[in-house]
Amino acid sequence: MSAPKIPEPVKDLKVEFTKIFINNEFVDSVSGKTFATINPSTGEKLAEVQEGDKADIDKAVAAARAAFKRDAEYRKHDASDRGRLLFKLADLIEAHRVQLRTLETLDNGKPFAMSYLGDTLMAQKVLRYYAGFADKIVGQTIPADGNVFCYTRHEPVGVVGAITPWNFPLHLAASKIAPAIAAGCTLVLKPAEQTPLTALYLASLVKQAGFPAGVINIVPGLGHTAGAALTNHPDINKITFTGSTEVGQLIIQGSGKTNLKRVTLELGGKSPNIIFPDSDLDYAVEVSHQAIMANMGQVCCAGSRTFVHEDIYEEFVRRSVERAKKRTVGDPFDPKNENGPQVDETQLKKILELIESGKTEGAKLECGGKRLGDKGYFVEPTVFTDVTSSMRVAKEEIFGPVQLIFKFKDVDEVIERANDTSYGLAAAVFTKNIDTALKVANSLEAGTVWVNTYNHFAFQAPFGGYKMSGQGREFGHYGLEAFLEVKTVYVRTPTKL
């Protein structure tokens, strides 16, 4: 099968949507404040965006609550109508995919080809998956003791607060919206302040798709103001968040201090990628390289700790360094480039500081380790060896193109070392031995384990983490259940039914 043709990006794309979206209208912030969103390839301003804060969150939550009232238009819709709206939104994303991916590459910095073939397609898929689920939410009849008819209802949890990260802005906005709407909820979405533009473009498509006013509201703003207001709001029934573990902990605290709102968290990772000597070495080197370098290393489940058996360690390192040196970095609109910039200057500085800490603590820098150029936020693909588990680079989430390669001797040792982390989002094992593969997969403390592959996702399957990598699951029916409350009803009957 030939590779899909990638269209040209939109030249000189005008940033059209920069306002807050409440009740199907674009409005200015209550305060009148704006914030700049920056092109990470150049460091230059793309646009000024309306800066929502507590007052704007209050307005958005009120709109979502009004849309959720029992007598509201939205609540009178059939479940299949909610599915139809999600299908329509997916179709509109497909129709606008070139504009959306151009905008995402400008605002986020990821290569245009990756945006077009990956993120936009994922957004469409997740919307269509949950669109099909909307009219298939069913309860049970229960053979309870006594003269009663007993059944369950699965009801929408209510008003949802969704907070999305900057690494997959459009895809993860759609991933929050889809199950919430399928379940019958309304929501307020706050996109990451680094990358608000595709979420606001999506807002225009929400209105075009025909969603009733107030069902989906999108408020750009800063995390410590708009984000905090959303997580602490007493009229929000559930928070769904993807981002850092530190912010996830604040969300849990906010839930406990307010109304015990339901919480789903998909947080950080330090995922082990284990290579056994019987694996296909060329394949394992390439997949391990992509597992940490793709999206500039800005992936929560990136294979950031590569464990290689001692029998193939030296050759694996040699080939991995050779591959990293060949990885092309530069303008994300140039199809020859595999990596664009990191998302912003803060992230750039964090990555470079952690690289320096690795060198200081005794890790061997095999290649890379420096900023590329002085314009934009580009980092060289970097490989470290001689890393120990006590080093900061081995413990902290770098979220950049930095591969750490460890040596191991046997299965039990590598399982113990792989699990020696506070995270547990994902893991991988490469081997031709099914017994080894299953032993390792079943022993790893991770929500997802890949065998002889990496970063393979299906919306039919749940995704989420053990330990400090999160709480709850997204995708599949597990992800839908997170937006539902289960009610048990007993009806007294004259006789046993």
From Swiss-Prot:
Which Gene Ontology biological process is one annotated for this entry? ethanol catabolic process
Q: Which InterPro entries match?
A: Ald_DH/histidinol_DH, Ald_DH_C, Ald_DH_CS_GLU, Ald_DH_N, Aldehyde_DH_dom
Q: Please give the Gene3D superfamilies that the UniProt record associates with this protein.
A: Aldehyde Dehydrogenase, Chain A, domain 1, Aldehyde Dehydrogenase, Chain A, domain 2
Show the active-site residues: E266 (proton acceptor), C300 (nucleophile)
EC class, as a word, reads oxidoreductase
Which keywords accompany this UniProt record?
NAD, Oxidoreductase
The name on file for this protein is Aldehyde dehydrogenase
Organism field: Enchytraeus buchholzi
**Which lineage?**
Eukaryota, Metazoa, Spiralia, Lophotrochozoa, Annelida
